[in-house]
Design a protein with these regions (language model features):
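Active-site beta-strand/loop microenvironment that shapes enzyme catalytic pockets
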Residues: 254-296
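Intrinsically disordered, low-complexity terminal tails and inter-domain linkers enriched
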Residues: 66-83, 368-398
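A residue-level signal for conserved active-site and pocket-lining positions in enzyme catalytic cores
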Residues: 174, 186, 278, 442-443, ...
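Portal/gating segments that form or line small-molecule/metal binding sites
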Residues: 242-254
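Long, compositionally biased intrinsically disordered regions
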Residues: 2-33, 40-43, 64, 76, ...
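Catalytic or ion-translocation cores adjacent to nucleophile or general acid/base/metal-coordination motifs
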Residues: 279-343
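C-terminal amphipathic alpha-helical segment
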Residues: 315-371, 395-410, 414
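N-terminal extension/subdomain marker
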Residues: 1-232, 460, 465
């Protein structure tokens, strides 16, 4: 059996490039907050940046291109015609943006913007956020060891159901790209041997040869000897993303890391990595790779070493204290809230479920009416005000617990009902929102319906995936929105 996690030739910006402007957050974040991406674009200006070689999903599927099947189903996407904004990127069509991305990638490869920073090695990542210091190791996974079909029991597995309609527009972005920039984070179930790691204080280069002997806490052990590694970058991240440092894991240390994960692979029972973030991004990489294999353009020998066979990812330890599972909320817009709530209650009854007042699923929405009728009668109603104290519309919320759901997750029940509702209410749009405050603000801004959920216990993730295949889509998020992965490292995928 070949290793599913391997070293890579990793590209990074050349010396002198502003790393803070280079690194931007994952493209699937802030999909309903155009102000965020406008601020990023303004901040980056003309500097070399990953903003120029990724496609923020808020701009994917503009009105002009929906007729070309490039729309992003269910993403709450807004374009410049809808928002009134005229930024450079908001004004581009999908095809224009993709062409620009491909051209800019080629330019960065030829004009010295990118250089090979690590040869046949890994990058140890140290990310500091409000949740703490989150560690990771960036390397290549073999896409032949991954599948987003829950029936396939591969070494690398999706954690949520893949929305097939979301793949084609992403394939269009990736299929002619020269490089990839990962925001995919995979999780490994690797309990930490704290005693062994604490014994590495004041580590020397000789300690690197012991990595392969580490049975628990591989990433944490490598971090314990970080002072023996070459620092690659050290920068603040824009827009409240915290701080990030990267270290080159090369030579003997890289060989030891490969051996340590190979040993973990041999003892994992056939399930080594779960996709923590970037399920659809990795599904896109897999689809592109399968398309290449089917194209007939390459021999079997050529396919073995084709760059697109592998995807660059960051591996994180499920047991890290700084790796927090956060809920992903729902935002429904263009909706008759009373109609949706009636539908929800009817479906709960139809499924033989019972509910009581609680906080497993909380609906929040703007109630129409005057301020006189907005006087709060109980703690479940909040009157919103302008800065000058004038009453606007009241915000109502109501929460439930489902008492007889057994092993089913509240998000599973909710998403099933929402999917059914959306099938017969084509004008209603759904978006997936990270963070309580963001959803509170969007409910007021859009006059839609926000649905708040609770986080799941991360210790249940691997058993749940191993037993049942996948969780409902958008069940959890690694950290808050500004704690998601920022683009930094690059990997060449064209031949």
């Amino acid at each position: 059996m070949s290793n599913c996690f391997n070293p890579a030739n990793i590209l990074l910006p050349n010396d002198g490039i502003d790393m803070e402007k280079w690194s931007v957050i994952a493209c699937d974040q802030f999909t309903s907050q155009a102000d965020y991406w406008e601020a990023v674009e303004k901040h980056v200006a003309d500097a070399p940046s990953t903003l120029n070689v990724v496609f923020p999903e808020i701009y994917l599927g503009t009105i002009e291109n929906q007729e070309n099947d490039c729309n992003l189903s269910g993403a709450g996407v807004k374009n410049d015609k809808e928002t009134g904004r005229k930024t450079k990127y908001a004004s581009m069509t999908d095809d224009e943006r993709i062409k620009y991305i491909n051209t800019t990638m080629d330019t960065y490869l030829t004009d010295g913007t990118l250089k090979q920073a690590v040869a046949d090695g890994y990058v140890l990542v140290e990310r500091t956020t409000e949740s703490g210091v989150r560690l990771g190791i960036v390397g290549l996974i073999d896409l032949d060891d991954y599948d987003f079909d829950p029936k396939k029991k591969t070494l690398i597995r999706a954690t949520e159901g893949t929305v097939i309609s979301r793949i084609p527009p992403r394939v269009k972005i990736r299929e002619n790209a020269a490089i990839e920039l990962p925001h995919v984070m995979l999780l490994v179930d690797d309990p930490i041997d704290r005693q062994k790691i604490d014994g590495c204080q004041g580590a020397t280069q000789e300690d690197a040869v012991n990595i392969a002997a580490v049975k628990h806490g591989i990433i944490e052990y490598v971090y314990a000897i970080k002072d023996t590694l070459r620092k690659l970058y050290d920068t603040e991240l824009m827009q409240g993303g915290g701080h990030i440092r990267g270290y080159a894991v090369e030579g003997e240390a890289a060989k030891q890391v490969t051996e340590a994960f190979a040993a973990k692979q041999n003892s994992c029972g056939g399930f080594l990595f779960a996709v923590g973030d970037g399920n659809h991004s990795l599904a896109t990489a897999k689809t592109c790779w399968e398309n290449i294999k089917k194209s007939g353009k390459f021999t079997e020998e050529q396919l073995k070493t084709h760059h697109a066979r592998h995807a660059l990812v960051e591996i994180c330890n499920l047991h890290s204290e700084a790796l927090e599972f956060k809920p992903i909320h729902r935002l429904l817009t263009n909706i008759d809230v009373k109609d949706m709530l009636s539908f929800f209650e009817a479906e709960i009854t139809k499924q033989g479920l019972e509910s009581t007042e609680g906080d497993e699923i909380v609906f929040e929405y703007v109630e129409s009416g005057s301020c006189d009728s907005a006087k709060p009668a109980n703690g479940n109603e909040v009157v919103s005000e302008n800065n000058d104290g004038r009453c606007t519309a009241p915000i109502k919320n109501s929460g439930i617990n489902i008492t007889n759901r057994g092993d089913r997750l509240p998000v599973e029940i909710l998403q099933g009902i929402l999917d059914k509702y959306l099938e017969t209410h084509g004008n209603v749009e759904i978006d997936y929102i990270h963070g309580d405050e963001a959803l509170h603000g969007l409910v007021k801004e859009t006059k839609g319906c926000g649905i708040f959920l609770q986080s799941i216990d991360k210790s249940t993730l691997f058993p749940a995936i191993n037993a049942g295949g996948v969780l409902p889509r958008k069940t959890f998020s690694i950290g808050e929105a500004n704690e998601k992965r920022y683009y930094m490292e690059c990997h060449k995928i064209s031949m």
